[in-house]
Regions:
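Short, structured active-site-proximal loop/turn typified by the sulfatase FGly-forming signature C/S-X-P-X-R
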Residues: 2-33, 80
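Stable alpha-helical elements in mature extracytoplasmic
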Residues: 3-7, 36-40, 61-68, 75, ...
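Loop/turn elements at helix/coil->beta-strand transitions in domains of secreted/extracellular proteins
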Residues: 13-20, 72-79, 150-156
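A short aromatic-anchored loop/beta-hairpin motif
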Residues: 18-22, 32-39, 43-49
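Solvent-exposed loop/turn segments at secondary-structure junctions
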Residues: 25-28, 49-50, 85-90, 162-166
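Second-shell loop/turn segments in exported
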Residues: 28-31, 50-57, 128-134, 146, ...
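Catalytic-site neighborhoods of secreted/periplasmic enzymes
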Residues: 47-125
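Active-site His/acidic residue clusters
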Residues: 94-96, 142-169
Length: 169
């Protein structure tokens, strides 16, 4: 609670966290690839796909939970994704699904950006980059929180990267 008040104050009341074995919520991936794209496909679709054998930017043929939600009349236009890694538009298949995905250093596709969103989009690439295809988690976090505050979506997927990337160093 003290270290991560957002989790304690917001997610505990309005969201869900999966993968806390102490709470009986165990998540176990079954794909045999043990790297990013196949793993995220499995997390977002609910099943492993043995045909996904790389992290290449290839549009996912599988429908994610985000796409299924966006196709539901109660969620249509109220689903979004904010991801640090620039491959997520392909994993989520933003073109087919209609789910807006802010990932990597791509700009938001909105004509009504807040001052903070415009600031982040203009300046996020002006600091030294640790990888050219991964946005710093701070920017992903700010953009996602600003979206939640201003657009009141019903479902938001947020994927940070630094704990993964920096653990490989």
């Amino acid at each position: 609670q003290k270290l991560l008040p957002f989790f304690g104050n917001y997610i505990d009341n309005k969201g869900i966290l999966i993968g806390n074995k102490n709470e009986g919520s165990v998540l176990k991936l079954t794909n045999d690839q043990l790297f990013s794209y196949p793993g995220y496909n499995e997390i977002l679709t609910g099943f492993a796909d043995d045909s996904i054998r790389s992290n290449d930017k290839i549009y996912n043929k599988n429908k994610t939970i985000l796409e299924l939600l966006n196709a539901n009349k109660n969620y249509s236009g109220k689903v979004a994704a904010f991801c640090s890694w620039d491959v997520f538009p392909f994993i989520i298949n933003d073109k087919r699904s209609g789910v807006p995905v802010s990932a990597g250093y791509s700009n938001l596709e909105s004509k009504k950006l807040s001052k903070l969103e415009s600031f982040i989009e203009n300046y996020q690439t002006m600091i030294p980059l640790f990888r050219d295809n991964v946005r710093y988690d701070l920017f992903t976090h700010i953009l996602s929180m600003e979206h939640i505050k201003n657009r009141t979506p019903k479902a938001v997927y947020i994927s940070y990267d630094e704990t993964d990337s920096f653990s490989h160093a």
